[in-house]
Regions:
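Flexible mid-to-C-terminal extensions adjoining Fe-S/redox cofactors in radical SAM and related proteins
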Residues: 263-386
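Short, flexible loop/turn elements at secondary-structure junctions
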Residues: 11-15, 60, 91-95, 117, ...
Length: 386
């Protein structure tokens, strides 16, 4: 895709759930108006990009209500038609109704939600009753034709029960996307739930094994992305690419930020959609310069790393969270990324080069088939799925 562009729309930072490790909700947060949506469209008319993806995030985006999306989706779809807009949403599904589901289905909005495994694990991390409320919303979304995938947040506590969590996703037939609990720029105790990088790396290797063992019955999106990174030598999701200048978030009042993770923190405001800032103006703001400084830091600090092309130092937010807000290192999960990249790379090498050829006769050698699916089998599966 040429010149991809991602705009995260944060209708509100409010959220009815009380996840214990959450850093992106804010009580009493205002809700975005349709007028602000129109301002977003007008702002984007001055942005030269061929495609754009809009992700409704939060907080909890469904708090904006059915009327908001009934108006916002056609305004964006028609106003940004030249950019061929796609849509997505990240929601806990508590406020999903048949009415909202029909509105979202009309615009083919895929849903990302959050379940941390079996009910007791989920509720211990996200609050009593979370699991049942989300599953109720999931049923409504599914029955109205919406595609739903789940993010599973692994904390330093739940990672100890990884086998139960994988078994849950396998039995439910859910596509799994892993998210490690992260330190936060907003928290007074940022590491209370955070998964340590070394443990995260070992978890990724475990999930690689599980994805390959259950290759025909389970999909783990992170493993797909990581294998694609190593195989193509290019990052395929925002964590492993230079996101600065191609990803922005718009808060409820129209303020523009480098990413949804910064929304609500005034020191990271880059501009406002009402002022129609150019990309150059946004990147010249203090927070824009900070993002570019991270890119420059990675070029120097990671210049000799063989994974730099498809890692790019990881996530800038993760890098700034421990300091806080200063660039003094790369993403702390560097240890985990190296661990899984090395593991995938070594398995690819073994699969492609280590096995001696078998003689098929007529001078035609054939590679010996592995006894169980490997990384190449996963790459073939992804290629067939498009």
């Amino acid at each position: 895709m040429k010149n991809p562009f991602h705009v995260m729309i944060i209708p509100t930072l409010g959220c009815p759930s009380k996840c214990k490790y959450c850093w992106s909700s804010e009580e009493g947060s205002p809700v975005m108006t349709v007028e602000t949506v129109k301002e977003i469209v007008e702002w984007l008319k001055g942005i030269d990009r061929e495609r754009v993806t809009f992700t409704f995030h939060g907080g909890e985006p469904l708090l904006a209500g059915a009327d908001f999306y009934r108006q916002a989706l056609p305004i964006i779809s028609e106003g940004c038609a030249r950019m061929h807009p796609d849509f997505a949403m990240q929601t806990n599904l508590w406020r999903m109704t048949p009415e909202i589901a029909d509105v979202l289905a009309a615009y083919h909005v895929p849903i990302g939600s959050s379940i941390d495994g079996p009910e007791d694990i989920t509720d211990s991390q996200r609050g009593d009753g979370y699991f049942q409320k989300t599953m109720k919303g999931y049923t409504i979304a599914r029955d109205h034709g919406l595609s739903v995938r789940f993010i599973c947040t692994f904390t330093n506590k739940s990672a100890k029960r990884k086998e139960e969590i994988v078994r849950f996703f396998l039995e439910q037939g859910f596509v799994l996307k892993l998210h490690p609990a992260l330190p936060s720029l907003r928290s007074e105790n940022p590491k209370e739930w955070a998964l340590e990088p070394v443990d995260y790396g070992e978890l990724l290797v475990y999930l690689l094994d599980q994805a390959l063992e259950h290759i025909d019955s389970m999909e783990i999106m992170n493993i797909n992305d990581l294998c694609r990174c190593v195989f193509t030598r290019h990052g395929s999701v925002c964590t492993y690419v230079d996101c600065m200048g191609s990803t922005f978030a718009v808060g409820p009042d129209g303020s523009i930020y480098p990413c949804y993770r910064f929304v609500g923190m005034p020191e990271y405001v880059m501009g406002n959609v009402a002022d129609r800032p150019s990309l150059e103006t946004l990147m010249a703001s203090p927070s824009g310069k900070l993002m570019l400084a991270f890119k420059d830091y990675v070029d120097t600090a990671c210049g000799s790393c063989k994974h730099i092309r498809y890692c790019r130092g990881g996530c800038p937010y993760n890098a700034m969270a421990p300091t806080p807000g200063r660039i003094e290192g790369v993403d702390p999960h560097c240890v985990a990324y190296k661990r899984i990249f090395e593991e995938i790379g070594s398995r690819l090498d073994e699969e492609m080069f280590a096995e001696p050829p078998m003689d098929m006769g007529f001078g035609m050698p054939a590679a010996k088939k592995p006894s169980k699916p490997g990384v190449m089998a996963l790459m073939r599966k992804m290629a067939m799925q498009g």
